[in-house]
Amino acid sequence: MDSLASLVLCGVSLLLSGTVEGAMDLILINSLPLVSDAETSLTCIASGWRPHEPITIGRDFEALMNQHQDPLEVTQDVTREWAKKVVWKREKASKINGAYFCEGRVRGEAIRIRTMKMRQQASFLPATLTMTVDKGDNVNISFKKVLIKEEDAVIYKNGSFIHSVPRHEVPDILEVHLPHAQPQDAGVYSARYIGGNLFTSAFTRLIVRRCEAQKWGPECNHLCTACMNNGVCHEDTGECICPPGFMGRTCEKACELHTFGRTCKERCSGQEGCKSYVFCLPDPYGCSCATGWKGLQCNEACHPGFYGPDCKLRCSCNNGEMCDRFQGCLCSPGWQGLQCEREGIQRMTPKIVDLPDHIEVNSGKFNPICKASGWPLPTNEEMTLVKPDGTVLHPKDFNHTDHFSVAIFTIHRILPPDSGVWVCSVNTVAGMVEKPFNISVKVLPKPLNAPNVIDTGHNFAVINISSEPYFGDGPIKSKKLLYKPVNHYEAWQHIQVTNEIVTLNYLEPRTEYELCVQLVRRGEGGEGHPGPVRRFTTASIGLPPPRGLNLLPKSQTTLNLTWQPIFPSSEDDFYVEVERRSVQKSDQQNIKVPGNLTSVLLNNLHPREQYVVRARVNTKAQGEWSEDLTAWTLSDILPPQPENIKISNITHSSAVISWTILDGYSISSITIRYKVQGKNEDQHVDVKIKNATITQYQLKGLEPETAYQVDIFAENNIGSSNPAFSHELVTLPESQAPADLGGGKMLLIAILGSAGMTCLTVLLAFLIILQLKRANVQRRMAQAFQNVREEPAVQFNSGTLALNRKVKNNPDPTIYPVLDWNDIKFQDVIGEGNFGQVLKARIKKDGLRMDAAIKRMKEYASKDDHRDFAGELEVLCKLGHHPNIINLLGACEHRGYLYLAIEYAPHGNLLDFLRKSRVLETDPAFAIANSTASTLSSQQLLHFAADVARGMDYLSQKQFIHRDLAARNILVGENYVAKIADFGLSRGQEVYVKKTMGRLPVRWMAIESLNYSVYTTNSDVWSYGVLLWEIVSLGGTPYCGMTCAELYEKLPQGYRLEKPLNCDDEVYDLMRQCWREKPYERPSFAQILVSLNRMLEERKTYVNTTLYEKFTYAGIDCSAEEAA
């Protein structure tokens, strides 16, 4: 038999999640299901495009267990590109009887088609090879008696006996009746005489749809499309499975003569077309003849007036139209429909136009377009795009003209693995068409090396862009050189370059720049990622700016700018240029001041306006501008009344008053006036606060249970504000003992007093013993902390904190949000060190209850420890809120000790979190079963790194240096967000030089910090590189096995932490950039964050947590992690 008998991969959709589906159609053609002495075969054909997984043919032991066990000889059909077949020669006829399947897979989903073969000389023959019914139908399964024997007839289902008929009652038509068929009734039914065997059995297969007639869906509550020409509605998708010889969304369109398949592209090449081919499709269709043929062997032509598969359809053509046994009614022009019953434009099979065979695209966003004609025009739902892995995409945008429909699809990020054959598919009532095309996805180019700086001047630089070698695909269409000042928040500028050597002009003198190269390949979206960054500094020119610049208001229209005397090194004439501009208005003025002066009055200004001023010293060349100074002119009106006045934390003798003031009114002080209600005006008390930045104050020494009248004023150069109304303050009552005790109670008091004295004596003895024990500890601590009580390290006053730093001019005290001691409910100790403790607590803040972590110092903490602890509060107050730092909730002073409330991180510190993820150590069975070394993915680890970089970028913008950046000082909060913590060593200045001895985190410190005790944001970048190493190594100890002395020796010689085995080169390269010896060559935190965000977008495994052979974790040495 011709090898055309085939399995065709076409398109029944298997619904997956969202808007993506996996699509596959199967057709199995069984040549001569009734086996005689002739050759018979099964052939599978994959049409259209190559499936990702091979198709298979095998024996269906699920349907029939007791069939032959011999393996099938499956070969490639050489007549077609993608086809498999099994051929049985005549001499193997005895081994053919049984059930078979053909299976195909797309994206792991399997579609299986079943069929049977039986002997033509069987005692019974089935009425049909398969029978498809709906749930609830009444079913009669029929077998025709061919041979007469004096034996009982028996019927089996899937090889198991279910029914028998006595020998004298065996009818000519043997039937099995199934009232109200259910899905469990489906299966292979066989009939034979009791003395027969598999060789003499007849088979038929019953298919029961999961839903009732014309219904589909998981709950069978959707109405099926009207499937014509004996098409069957699929109970999972609602789509019509069209019989061989018909196509389209409703199976109305007839194929050309002797063609079949979803798009009618396959052809029966026999002399009589599709005669003797039994076509089997995926359930619930089953098997049938091609259109125009009938009979078990599909070798009988339809009688006149009938057409379609198995000739079950009757022609009822209107207007005297002819009936064709293959296509049905042949309608004249102007008429359409199954019976030519409708007038209208003749339907036209859709065609896909203007789609090239090959498309080259760049990785990134991609918007392919499918354009099709036909009548009726295809709709949005009828056009799809199939990816090489079988994913079906639906249009994101759609439009049509008079002759064409255009579907626009969106792939947000196409990558090289998406290269391959894509298919545009159109399926309408007029037919179906598919057009495969090849997409080649190119990798965007990126230079491997940073550009080199050949020469620099004060306003130019000569650059070798080093565009080759590069990573990715060419050819290169153009090249861009990107550059910008390092410390300015400006967008990157760029110039197009054609040569390798280029000159950058119009640069600012004595400015640090960073630059990189971006390559562009042909095609839309061809701009690659910028390459490595190079930094350089332009030369100086002119004189430095004046020193000691100070800007103060003089009057309502005058500001006074002063500076120290200038002594230029050259004899050239010089002058001071002052630039003044208004913040509120577009008003700018430049003033020239003789070089021998040390001040200038800026006149003709506007009252209550903020100005920005800068200055430089010019000779023949222009000097460098100073930093911007800002000041307000004095006010011309009375200041507005303080706003948001609140009275809180009221006790029997004190209360806290808070307020806010508006900028721009030259407010110099705040006055709080209070008196007992009802007393004379001259009996008030005035509290004058000369620091206008203070916004809260605690009134003390108030009388219990007393009503006070409180007024608050703002004062400026004009006068005091006028309060709109007074505020009432009522203190709480003081708890008192009863004033008089009756004589009858004296005896009771005496008894209780005696018992109390006894208890007091016992308690006193216990305290003395406890004090003696503690005395030993205090003596041990005395030498280290003998000066603790000489001068308090921290002073508190009603929401303000002052640090005694032993400098001539102490800065203004720090103002912090106050928590009431009674609003803190302590729970568990969650962390403890030598001199500090962290407790979990529930606090009440702004009326809301929340979890918090409370930090406090122990009794033996030194003055430096107290100062660092208070410094942490100072830092947190100045930093403000950010999602990637542990934020301050409030603070409380109780009995001379400071209690600091910060966000509670439920997952603890990052170091412990990483080490707990080492599942090979904690749960080896789980690790081996899942082939993983960590419970954390590459994406999660990179998210931790990006969170820390984002927080450190914020700190660097605020000009804060952390000085102790390590995984142990990162906390993991809600939703696994990493937050920077432990600001005890932080400093709010650009460069900090440590002058005192203390514990040092040597393994995380930069070279310049180890050698010179200098700390900058660049030294924090070094520490970040070590933290990144900790993340990748899942909590390993840096330089494990090395002493601190060895580090002091080896780091200046170029030694660095080795690359972890599970680390991608790109991540390790980022670490190495952080460990560059010259601080100014290290990347900024903003650049680090850009690199990490790009890695997260790539979705590549940058940190491999897969369990491979001989896997080992990085070493851990807890003793080495203690600060030196």
UniProtKB/Swiss-Prot annotation:
EC number: 2.7.10.1
Boundaries of every EGF-like domain copy: 210-252, 254-299, 301-341
Domain of life of the native organism: Eukaryota
Xref: Gene3D superfamilies: Immunoglobulins, Phosphorylase Kinase, domain 1, Tie2 ligand-binding domain superfamily, Transferase(Phosphotransferase) domain 1
InterPro entries for the chain: EGF-like_dom, FN3_dom, FN3_sf, Ig-like_dom, Ig-like_dom_sf, Ig-like_fold, Kinase-like_dom_sf, LE_dom
Residue numbers annotated as active site: 964 (proton acceptor)
Extracellular side stretches: 23-748
Recorded consequence of changing residue 919 to L: In VMCM; increased ligand-independent autophosphorylation and kinase activation
Chain ranges of the Fibronectin type-III domain: 447-541, 545-636, 641-735
GO MF term (any one): signaling receptor activity
CDD domains according to UniProt: EGF_Lam (cd00055), FN3 (cd00063), IgI_Tie2 (cd20964), PTKc_Tie2 (cd05088)
Subcellular location: Cell membrane; Cell junction; Cell junction, Focal adhesion; Cytoplasm, Cytoskeleton
Protein known as: Angiopoietin-1 receptor
Species name: Homo sapiens
